[in-house]
Structure formats: C-alpha cells, structure tokens
C-alpha cells in the first residue's frame, strides 16, 4: 500500500458486493421457485453463495480493522453514520408493512366481510406463544446491554456470558416463531390478513436471524480478544441492530397480534 497522509481508509477493490448482490438475486428467485414450483435448488444455491460471501467479506473487514489498523477514529465515525442510516432505512422498510396492515384493518372492505380479522380467519392468541416471544426478546435486550457494559468495564468473561445468552435467546425466538408458523390456522395465501401477517413477522424473523449471525461473529471475535473497551464498533453495531429488532417486535406484537386479533 502506498504512503498516505490522511486518516481515511482507501478500500481495495473487492468482489464481495457483486457476489452479495448475485446471491440476493438467487435467494429471492429461489424463494419464488420454492413457493410456486416446490423446488428448493435455487434457494439453496443462493443461501450457499450468501454464506460464502458473508464469511469472506467479514474476514476482509476484520483483517483491515483489527490487524492492519485501518479503522481510525475518522473511519469509525463514518461507519457509525452508515449504521445509523441503515437502521433508518430499515425503519422505513417496516413502516411500509405497518401501513399495509393498518390500511387494510382500519377500514375493512366488503370483500373481507366488513370486519377485522376477516370472516373465516382465526387469529393466534396474543397471550400464548407471541407473549413468550416478546418476553424472550426483551430478555435478550437486557443481556446484550449487560454484554456492552461488561465490555466497557473490561470484564471479558461476563461479556462472553451475556453475549452467549443473547444468542441463545435469539435462536430460541426463531424456533418458537417457526413452530408458530407451522401450527398457524391460516396461510400466507389467506387474503390480506395472511399476507400482512406472514410478510411482516417473516421479515422480522429474517432480521432476528441476521442479528443472531452478527452476534455469533462478535462472540467468536471476542474469544480471540478482538474487542477492547475503546475499539469495538463491530459489537456496538450488532447491539444497535439487536435493539432495533427488539423495538420492531414490540410494534408487531401490539399491532398485529394484540390489537389486530
């Protein structure tokens, strides 16, 4: 690398944005193939290429930040702004789903029987699995905060314990959500209720899986002593993302499960 007299990281050309975009195309196309033709080949190919891209891109970022020291305070500031803008874009993404839900439920059309939930739909009891899911995610919000405070205080063991608990709760939430989908008395094709329910909660579930993956990477990085109390933006970004997932679930629970039932 040539000598530089500024504090900014000039990133080398990378193939991972392109392979990431192609894997996203394969996954979305694969999802359509699965829904319409019951074939999972394309979906599996997309998931495989996505996981390979994630591994190699994360490897590059860890090398540049932890081992080459490219993540100066100026670079970290830019990354913080980037993460904040990303979370704002995700908020707007979910706003679209809530808009669709309230548009359909506040003024039900005659086709829906003029009522909400529509005639023939038996909604899930909000005081059963959904309430358990809420308590699981709230507990994970507490444990990720504990992990962050432990890291700031230099208590590595407590940080690892808290991070492990958060990951376990995230996996538990995903399993509960999967069992709920399996046992639900309606499907994604059951009119606007099924569509809004499964798309909104499904995309949230996808975000929980992404957040859990992010935290697992942080866990293995901390096992290798990558984070210090003053240099840990990778973990901080994961914590912000997890809190965002937490808050979105509270809105989903109150809107779709509790009020919508």
From Swiss-Prot:
Give the location in the cell. Mitochondrion inner membrane
> Secretion signal: which residues?
none
Cite the GO molecular-function annotations of the record. cytochrome-c oxidase activity
Subcellular location, principal:
mitochondrion
Tell me the residue ranges located in the Mitochondrial intermembrane compartment per UniProt. Answer: 35-40, 106-128, 184-190, 257-261
Q: What are its E.C. numbers?
A: 7.1.1.9
Q: Which SUPFAM superfamilies match?
A: Cytochrome c oxidase subunit III-like
Function summary: Component of the cytochrome c oxidase, the last enzyme in the mitochondrial electron transport chain which drives oxidative phosphorylation. The respiratory chain contains 3 multisubunit complexes succinate dehydrogenase (complex II, CII), ubiquinol-cytochrome c oxidoreductase (cytochrome b-c1 complex, complex III, CIII) and cytochrome c oxidase (complex IV, CIV), that cooperate to transfer electrons derived from NADH and succinate to molecular oxygen, creating an electrochemical gradient over the inner membrane that drives transmembrane transport and the ATP synthase.
Name this protein carries in UniProt:
Cytochrome c oxidase subunit 3
Q: Which organism is it from?
A: Gazella gazella (Mountain gazelle)
Q: Which gene underlies this protein?
A: MT-CO3
